[in-house]
C-alpha cells in the first residue's frame, strides 16, 4: 500500500489493480471513498481496462478470432508494479502477459499515476501500444464515494451536479448482457445544473451518458457548490480524471 499525504488529505493506493483505496479528508475528519464492504460492493475505485462495461455475451471478435473477457476487463484484478514514487505522486505499471493475451491479444503497457496537490487528486492513465497494429481499447475510472458524506444527512439530501446544463440524455443497460440499449433514450431534467439523488434512481443499474455531454460532475448538498467532483478530461497523450475535495 502506498500513501500520499499533506495537511489536507491522506490518500492510499494499492498495488492490486493500482486501485485508489482511500481519500481521508483531514479537515472534516471523514473518509471520502467507499469502504469496499463485500456484502454490498467489494471495491473502492477500480480501473476499467481494456474494456469499460461488458462485451455482448462476454465475447469480442478481434482479427477474426473470438476472445472472452469479463465485465470491465482484467486490469482491476491484476498486480501492478510501482515504478516511481515521489513526495506527492505514485506511478504503477501493468504490462501484457501470456495470460492477458488470452482475453485481449495485444502487447501493451498501462501506466496509472496518482498525484496529490492540496485538496486536488489527479488520476492519469497512459496506455502504450507495443504492437505494430491498431489496438482497440477503452479505459475508465469507477470510484465509489461515501454518501451520505456528512453526519446527520441521508443519501436523498444530496444532489448530482453538472456543468450548468438544463438536461441530459441517457441510456440504460440491458441487465441480461450488461450492454447499453442505444435504441431508447431518456431525459434527466436538471435544475440549476443539478438533480436530487432519488430513491430507486439506479435500480436499473448505471445511467449511460454519451456524446460528450458531461465534462464535469459532482456530489453536493444543495447549499454547497460542490463537495466532491470528478472532471474527466483528455490530455495529450493520456486521459485522466481529477477529484476536488471541498
Residue ranges and their predicted role:
Residues 1, 8-10, 87-91, 109-111, ...:
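Intrinsic-disorder/low-complexity, polar/charged segments enriched in Ser/Thr/Lys/Arg/Asp/Glu/Gln
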Residues 1-59, 66, 212-226:
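Beta-strand-rich N-terminal accessory domains
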Residues 5-7, 17, 54, 74-76, ...:
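Residues that act as N-cap/strand-start positions at coil-to-secondary-structure junctions
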Residues 13, 64, 123-127:
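Buried hydrophobic-core signal for structured, non-transmembrane domains
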Residues 66-118:
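Extended, loop-rich substrate-binding clefts of extracytoplasmic carbohydrate-active enzymes
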Residues 96-143, 150:
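Acidic, contiguous internal or C-terminal segments within carbohydrate-active enzymes
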Residues 136, 147-233:
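Active-site/ligand-binding surface loops and adjacent short beta/alpha elements
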Residues 226-246:
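A C-terminal functional module that forms or caps the active site or interfaces directly
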